[in-house]
Design a protein with these regions (language model features):
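Catalytic cores of peptidoglycan-degrading enzymes
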Residues: 1-78
Length: 78
């Protein structure tokens, strides 16, 4: 994958979030995670030009949407 180390989380409502280019992974397949839990360390693995987080939101497991309004709908302001 172009993301290098990456994590995919399936949320209880069916939404999938994807986190890419991670330097370290602190969870493994099948782990149940909680809000605020550290899941990885940011990095620059894969096709990347510098350390950053690649973040995607796929409501109901469908196509990716712009995460900013999706987060805002849930009370999270960037």
């Amino acid at each position: 994958s172009g993301f290098g180390n990456w994590i995919r989380i399936k949320h209880d409502d069916g939404t999938i979030t994807v986190y890419g280019h991670m330097a370290t992974l602190d969870v493994k397949v099948g782990d149940r995670v909680t809000s605020g839990q550290k899941i990885a360390g940011m990095g620059s693995l894969g096709f990347s030009t510098g350390s950053h987080l690649h973040f995607e939101v796929h409501p109901n497991g469908g196509d990716a949407v712009d995460p900013k309004p999706w987060l805002a709908e849930r009370g999270i302001q960037l």
